[in-house]
């Protein structure tokens, strides 16, 4: 058990950042198309 366990750090990081970026891009896409 080493302290530098990159996979155990990167997996939740990617699992959180990737959906967050997808949600942000989707939100911006909807905001740009709304034109109300």
Swiss-Prot record:
Q: Which UniProt keywords apply?
A: Chloroplast, Membrane, Photosynthesis, Photosystem I, Plastid, Thylakoid, Transmembrane, Transmembrane helix
Keyword Ribosomal protein among UniProt keywords? no
User: What top-level branch of life does the organism fall under?
Assistant: Eukaryota
The subcellular localization recorded is:
Plastid, Chloroplast thylakoid membrane
Q: What is its main location?
A: plastid
Assigned GO CC terms: chloroplast thylakoid membrane; photosystem I
| Residue ranges of the TM segments | 8-28
Recorded hits in InterPro entries, A to Z, give:
PSI_PsaI (IPR001302), PSI_PsaI_sf (IPR036357)
The cross-references to HAMAP family, in alphabetical order and at most eight, read:
PSI_PsaI
What does the protein in this record do? May help in the organization of the PsaL subunit.
Q: Which PANTHER family match?
A: PHOTOSYSTEM I REACTION CENTER SUBUNIT VIII, PTHR35775
What is the similarity comment for this entry?
Belongs to the PsaI family.
* Name of the protein this chain belongs to: Photosystem I reaction center subunit VIII
Q: Which organism is it from?
A: Daucus carota
The gene it comes from is: psaI
């Amino acid at each position: 058990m080493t302290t530098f366990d990159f996979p155990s750090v990167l997996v939740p990081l990617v699992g959180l950042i990737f959906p967050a970026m997808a949600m942000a891009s989707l939100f911006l896409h909807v905001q740009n198309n709304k034109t109300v």
